[in-house]
């Protein structure tokens, strides 16, 4: 038996006796029908509980993955790099003329920027993987919905032959598909003409002829007919999928805000549901993480540039270069001048670059060349 097998009971009654002298001869019993011991109310509560569990479990798995990727232990992680960055600035402020402090600040800044960029990249990767999971989940929901519609057709065919014939195994299989779909998304099922009969063990409610399966009032399965969910990747700047339902007149109903539970509901909670006019998600846990990281990086850049701005000057000059001839190479003038290149960058009061000049130095470079 499968995990979704429902207990069944044979309903019997006395068979017509053989009439004889001196009295009737009993011929045992006959099978009237076979019924499922199934309580639809309990089954509905089970599906809801299962949907809640899958929603919570998926969120837990993703958030654990994020925690493992971004540890903030005492000596590792982004927090440690930020603390080192501030300490390097303090050391540089106290010993600004020491070249070692400048090199230390540069190295620690490179470490911090790498960590921020790597964190942003990993969050983007997780964001994309959740979107991939959404596409797979929608495809599975559509597959399950079509299978349920096909089973409904088989149930109608079997039970139309006689009022005493019940398609119990097919109903078990449909319950299995319902439970699987409930793990993915918040669904409601409606079965008209449900029969209640307590003679066969507990509060038995089963059967039901007309069948409807819906997500927040939007019908996916109506008897033998199935209406699929559809995906659109045009609204999002990153090509992330949005979920919609298309009516017969091709009117679209946005489904992301109607899907609130199950594994797919958790995916949308994490990735985001609503896209603005620029194609950016306006909600979602991972979206908030990425936005907060971007805000942190931008704030760090602005405040660091403000430190430089405090020492901004209208002009600069060096020491008098005695005995410096215009045709003398720089490296002949001083052994401290090494081959290489650097940029001279000019910023305005808003921190925007307004001019840049690249200086290249080699063995033949003179002051006239620069």
Over which residues does each language-model region extend?
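Structural signature of extracellular appendage/secretion-system components
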Residues: 1-370
């Amino acid at each position: 038996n499968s995990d979704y097998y429902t207990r069944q009971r044979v309903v019997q009654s006395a068979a017509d006796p053989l009439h004889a002298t001196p009295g009737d001869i009993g011929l045992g019993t006959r099978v009237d029908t076979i019924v499922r011991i199934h309580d639809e109310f309990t089954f509905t509560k089970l599906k809801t509980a299962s949907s809640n569990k899958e929603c919570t479990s998926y969120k837990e798995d993703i958030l654990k993955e994020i925690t493992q990727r971004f540890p903030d232990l005492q000596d590792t992680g982004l927090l440690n790099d930020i603390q080192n960055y501030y300490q390097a600035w303090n050391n540089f402020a106290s010993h600004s003329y020491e070249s070692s402090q400048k090199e230390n600040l540069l190295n620690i800044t490179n470490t911090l920027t790498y960590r921020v960029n790597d964190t942003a990249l990993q969050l983007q990767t997780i964001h994309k993987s959740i979107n991939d999971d959404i596409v797979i989940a929608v495809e599975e929901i559509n597959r399950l919905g079509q299978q349920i519609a096909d089973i409904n057709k088989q149930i109608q065919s079997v039970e139309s032959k006689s009022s005493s014939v019940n398609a119990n195994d097919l109903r078990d299989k449909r319950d299995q598909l319902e439970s699987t779909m409930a793990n993915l998304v918040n669904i409601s099922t409606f079965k008209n003409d449900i029969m209640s009969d307590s003679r066969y063990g507990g509060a038995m409610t089963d059967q039901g002829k007309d069948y409807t399966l819906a997500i927040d009032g939007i019908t996916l399965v109506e008897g033998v007919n199935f209406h699929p969910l559809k995906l659109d990747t045009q609204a999002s700047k990153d090509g992330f999928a949005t979920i919609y339902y298309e009516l017969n007149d091709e009117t679209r109903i946005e489904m992301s805000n109607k899907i609130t539970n199950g594994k797919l509901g958790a995916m949308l909670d994490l990735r985001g549901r609503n896209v603005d006019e620029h194609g950016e998600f306006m909600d979602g846990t991972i979206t908030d993480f990425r936005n907060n990281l971007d805000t942190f990086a931008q704030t760090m850049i602005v405040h660091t540039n403000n430190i430089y701005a405090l020492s901004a000057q209208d002009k600069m000059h060096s020491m008098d270069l005695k005995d410096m001839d215009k045709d003398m190479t720089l490296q002949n003038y001083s052994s401290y001048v090494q081959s290489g290149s650097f940029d001279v960058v000019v910023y305005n009061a808003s921190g925007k670059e307004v001019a840049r000049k690249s200086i290249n130095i080699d063995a033949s470079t003179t002051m006239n060349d620069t």
